[in-house]
Structures are given as structure tokens and as C-alpha cells.
Amino acid sequence: DIVKKQKAEIANKFIKASINYNLKEEAYYSKEFKEIINSHDSTYAPLALFFLIDNKILNSNEEINHLFDQILNNVNLEREIKNLVIYKKGLINADFQPENIMIEILKPVINSESFWKPHSLLLLGDYFLFKGERQKAKDFYSQILTSQKTNENIFNQAQQRILKNYGE
């Protein structure tokens, strides 16, 4: 019963903070959402981090990655939710991380049969295409086309990128 009460308190805190959020009190709400993340609640910790990111409340990539790692290492997430958090971490890091870090971030997803695997492969393909590493990009796009788990939308995006960039 104590666990249910704590869960309800965290839920109420998240709802209040997300509804009442305003830029004038950004520091207060940043603290509120970080407290929710520190609660290690499997529902609201990831949602709090996504709120902070989506509303551009966090300025430091280092802090964002620290909070991602805190959730990934300390929150008991369902497998696909954890893979979604990993994928989202990859998305956030794609603009500034070197390739070895990007692959390290996404490795747990691309080495699995997760729903998020094709999304991660597409992200890496786009990452390498943007960097001018066409063969690496093509390799990731090709993995999508041969995967059993690829949804039609991701399959079509990979196929279009191969046709557009490689004429195949």
C-alpha cells in the first residue's frame, strides 16, 4: 500500500509540474522533474526526462546523458521501454557524438530483436550518411531491409535512401 501511495504521489507531482510548467519558473520545474527522475519510477522517470528535453530545459549534453544513464542504470524498465530510452538517447546524441560513442549507445538495441532495432539502424544509417561515410550508411540501411522485425514505414525509408543515394 505504501508503494501505491508513493506511485500516486509521483504521478501527481508529474501531472502538476507538466500542467503548470512555465518559463518564468524554469529552475523550480527543472528541480521538480529531476526529483521525479531520482524517484526511479518506471513510468514517470522517463517521462520527466523527456519533458525536460522536449521543452529544452536542460542546456548541457553532459547533464542530459547523465540523466539518461541514471534512468537506464537505476530504473526497472520493461525491455522495450528501456530500448526506447536507449534509442532516444541515440537521437539526442547524434548531433555531437563521434561514431564510437553512437555505436556504443545503440549497441544494446541493434544487437537485439527489439521493436526499436530498425529505428536505431535507420538512425545510424542517417548518421553515417550525414558524415559522408556512404558505405557504413548503406550497411545499416541494408540491415533494415533484411530484418524480420522491420515495420513497413522504416523499411520504405531505408529502401528510399538506398535508391536515392546509391541508385540500387
Predicted regions and their residues:
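Long, contiguous interaction/recruitment modules in multidomain scaffold/adaptor proteins
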Residues: 1-15, 34-35, 39-41
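Short helix-capping and inter-helix turn/linker motifs at the boundaries of alpha-helical repeat units
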Residues: 7-8, 24, 115
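Alpha-helical tetratricopeptide repeat
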Residues: 7-19, 46-50, 83-87, 121-122
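Amphipathic coiled-coil alpha-helices
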Residues: 13, 17-20, 29-32, 60, ...
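Extracytoplasmic/periplasmic/luminal assembly and interaction segments
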Residues: 24-76
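Soluble extracytoplasmic domains of inner/organellar membrane proteins
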Residues: 56, 65-168
